């Protein structure tokens, strides 16, 4: 006995097989969330702390997420597993996405390190919500929210 399949039947069977195989597949990407740190090529941002002053080792002296309009706002970025010269960029944005400051530093390969960024505005920051986004070698690696009250 011979079974004869039409072109439409073969197409339907192929489509069914493809859809069946895809149903159990999960994406390996996890979207980044505000206030998180992440890994990108060339290392990892493991922590962002923000506050009004720094210690000698570039850690924050008293972390906070709430600032006065005339405060200098410091960020201490902890990186891990950097194996080549790595570029860190800090982008500070105001609540509507307006970039208020952006600066870049190159760090030497050290495995783990702390890097400091800061912003100030002597005549005062507008009150509202701000976000610090840190980029590692051009890729978004972490964000931190803060507020000026």
PLM feature segments, named:
Residues 1-21:
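Sec-dependent bacterial lipoprotein signal peptides
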Residues 90-94, 134:
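Conserved aromatic beta-strand anchor motif in extracellular beta-sandwich/beta-rich domains
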Residues 106-113:
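Short proline/glycine- and polar residue-rich coil/turn motifs
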